[in-house]
Amino acid sequence: EAWYPYMEEKDLFGDLSGNIMFSKHYRYTPIFDHEHEFFEIICVYDGTSHTTIQGMSHELHTGDICIIPPHTMHSIGIFDDSLVFNILIRGSTFQSTFFQSLTADSALAHFFAHVLYRKTEGNYLIFHTFDDIRIRDMLENLYIEYLGHEKYSYTFLNSMLIMFWAMLLR
């Protein structure tokens, strides 16, 4: 069997010092349900993505960002020329960057912690950014930084993630 329906952090990140991985989602591939120990951020850069999360279907469009927490069954399908990026983040990195953005509003932090970590339906977040140019630029910069593999790139990526979360919450 080539596909594993469950993936642990060590399977993806291994001994890498990095906590964040970017990938372009392959188009025209079979849809398969899966879950994993890390966070997945689906970013629809252009076009449409058919996404099912815990049995609930969603059609994501250009500019939409979906945060899927660990241990959440989901699938993604792209069957045209759409461009979708996946950002895969270790759980500890997500917590340290995302919740650092929320320190000023403990009620909001509590809400997100509840939504993202409870084992109930709907424990994911979808942001409709309406293709906000600042968020689009940040995604591009995150991707370029990731591909560059320059010295201190993971420090930059963690810092950029904090800014990205703050932009989404605006």
Where are the language model's segments positioned?
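Detector for methionine-enriched segments
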Residues: 7, 21, 56, 73, ...
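N-terminal regulatory/effector-sensing and dimerization cores
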Residues: 21-109
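Generic alpha-helical secondary structure signal
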Residues: 8-10, 62, 150
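An amphipathic alpha-helical interaction segment
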Residues: 126-170
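A hydrophobic/aromatic-rich effector-binding and dimerization subdomain
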Residues: 1-19, 79-144
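Short intrinsically disordered, low-complexity coil segments enriched in acidic
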Residues: 2-6, 67, 170
